[in-house]
């Protein structure tokens, strides 16, 4: 069966469901999301919920997809989302760029990325840039991280 995964965060009983600024409990201001808590798909059994990593089981070309909700309250609300391979951001900045200008602004952020990876590599989703009072909310099934082997 072709390697594929899809994880999300239910977050029942735990309000740490965002990364960035914005007040309240946050996983971190920037960095990788390590607290996904639910799997919908994991055909190779290679996603580790304890650290938010998908360990590449077979070398090949992979498609990665991730989503969350950008929330902005005030200030210079710039947020970038990205993927990380073996702990490093896949680019010099994020794959997406969001900037708020309306109080209580919310919109969906979706990122995609295609890359050849070797067996044993690991991938994560995260936020390399979060300024002012904004965050990427991924709890309550409003965000997800997924991927699959193209070939």
Q: Which ranges hold each PLM region?
A:
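Glycine-rich strand-loop-strand elements at beta-sheet edges
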Residues: 85, 89-119
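Extracellular beta-strand-rich recognition modules
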Residues: 60-70, 108-112, 121-128
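Terminal (often C-terminal
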Residues: 1-76, 89, 99, 133-151
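A short linear-motif detector with a strong N-terminal bias
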Residues: 41-44, 102-104, 124-128
């Amino acid at each position: 069966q072709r390697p594929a995964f899809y994880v999300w965060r239910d977050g029942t009983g735990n309000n740490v469901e965002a990364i960035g600024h914005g007040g309240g409990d946050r996983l971190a201001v920037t960095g990788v999301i390590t607290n996904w808590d639910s799997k919908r798909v994991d055909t190779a059994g290679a996603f580790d919920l304890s650290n938010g990593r998908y360990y590449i089981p077979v070398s090949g070309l992979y498609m990665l997809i991730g989503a969350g909700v950008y929330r902005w309250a005030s200030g210079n609300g710039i947020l970038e989302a990205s993927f990380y391979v073996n702990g490093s951001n896949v680019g010099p900045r994020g794959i997406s760029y969001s900037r708020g200008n309306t109080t209580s602004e919310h919109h969906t952020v979706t990122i995609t990325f295609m890359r050849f990876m070797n067996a044993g590599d690991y991938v994560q989703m995260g936020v390399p840039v979060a300024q002012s009072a904004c965050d990427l909310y991924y709890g309550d099934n409003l965000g997800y991280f997924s991927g699959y082997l193209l070939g």
